[in-house]
Amino acid sequence: MKQKHAVHLAVRRAARRLAALAAGLALSFAAQAQTDLWSESYRLEGLGRYAEAQAQIAPLATRQPAHEFALIRSAWLQYLQGSHAEAEAQYQRALALNSRSIEAALGVMLPQMAQYRWADAIKSGRKVLANSPWDYTAHVRIMICEEATSRWDELAKHAAEVSSRYPTDATLLVYWARAESALRNTRRARELYAQVIERVPGHAEATKYLKSTQ
C-alpha cells in the first residue's frame, strides 16, 4: 500500500509539473505571437501598407479591457490611411481611457487639421496646453492653424513667445518670420530669417526671402 501511495504521489507531482510546463509554454507562445504581431505591424507600416499594419493589431485595439497603446497606434494608422473620422474617434477612445495622455490629446489634432477644421484643432491644442503649457508639438500645430487662417497678429505674438522658450529652434523662427512678412514688417522678417540661417545654414525659405528683399 505504501508503495502504491508513493507511486500515486509521484504521478500527481509529475502531472502538476507537466501542467505547469504546458502553461509556461502557452504563455511563451502567446508572448511570442504578440511580439510577432507588433513586429509585423511595424514592418508593414514601413512599406506604406497601413491598412495591413492596422489589421495586425486590430484584435488588441478592439478588445476589452482596452489596450491603450494599441488604440493610439491604430488611430495613427487610420490617420495615415486618410480615415480621419475613424482616427479621431480612436484617439478620443484612448483619451477616455487615460485622460492624462498628452499623446492621445495631440493625436486628436492630426485628423482635425487634415480636414481643415482649424478652430477644432486649436481648441484641442489648447486643452493640451492647459496641462502642459510649453508642449512644443501643441504650440507648433496651433501655429500651423493660425497660419492657415491668416491670423498673422496672433501667429507673430505666439511664435515670439514660444521662441523665447526654445531659442535655438529654427521652426518657430520661420513661423514668426512668415507672420512678420505677412504683416509687411519686412525688416523684422529679414532679421528673423537671418536667425534661421544661423541655425540651419542654407535654409531654402530663409535664403529665398533674404535674396528677394535685398
Which residues does each PLM region occupy?
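N-terminal leader/linker segments that initiate helical-solenoid repeat arrays
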Residues: 31-69
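Register position in tetratricopeptide repeats
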Residues: 46-47, 80-81, 114-115, 148-149, ...
